[in-house]
Amino acid sequence: MISRKDIDCGKEFDWGLTSENYAKYRDIYPAEFYKSIVELGCGTKGQRMLDLATGTGVLPRGMQKYGAKWTGADISKNQIKYARLLSEASGADIDYIASPAEELDFGAESFDGVTAAQCFMYFNQEVLLPKIHKWLKPGGHFLITIMDWLPFESEIAMKSEKLILKYNPAWSGCGRKRSTPSVPKCAEGLFDAKNIIAYATDIPFTSESWNGRIKACRGIEASLTSAEIEKWEAEHKKMLAEYPKSFKVPHFITIMDLVKI
């Protein structure tokens, strides 16, 4: 279990509880997201890359065709279990480690790039950033990426958020807007912020896949009881039945490119 005072008012959550649905419904990054990473000079043939808090390995699997050798690490053994299963099924050659990011131990200049997708907020950044700096080769890249749905631009997303809050009032992952993140203070002296890519994009869903994606979020399956999840899901599916079976939800993607000094 993870608990932080600045996330969900300290309510405990465990991503390992979401793994089955996470594996099935959260591989939703668009092709342009992966192309943006390559355009920043990361994930290409001959490079070694590390993905922190890899979950079920969505990002390294999506980057496989560009030729880099990837390692994925996650605090949850169950997430890593599914990451390995999915990689084996797709023929992806990815190494996986079950470990908190702050406890990883690699040699100096082990990687050309490090990625952290949807997860940087969970880390002890003062501990982790000097380690990432050590692991990166000279001029190496640390990419912090975020992809949030936009509830103020989607009626479905807004109604889904309201239902999450009904069953989990402590959930703090709501109300996201089009905004770019600030450079972490503890990056000063270690990294230069070379690029920040930001754009909106529509992600296609069906009623089933959107329900699964929301169910696998921190506010539901990672933190509620089975009885609470069952009640939420019945109400959520009833809400979705009022809309077409296929629809798009606007998301905002940001990629912050921190280059090792």
Please report, for each region that a protein language model flagged, where it lies by residue.
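Conserved class I S-adenosyl-L-methionine
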Residues: 1-44
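A short acidic, Gly/Pro-enriched loop at the edge of an enzyme's catalytic core
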Residues: 102-113
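Conserved Class I S-adenosyl-L-methionine
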Residues: 182-261
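Nucleotide donor/acceptor-binding cores
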Residues: 46-47, 109
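A short, conserved alpha-helix within the catalytic core of class I
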Residues: 123-132
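Conserved catalytic/acceptor-binding region of the Class I
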Residues: 133, 137-203
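Class I SAM-dependent methyltransferase SAM/SAH-binding core
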Residues: 50, 56-103
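A short beta-strand submotif of the Rossmann-like class I SAM-dependent methyltransferase core
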Residues: 116-117, 125
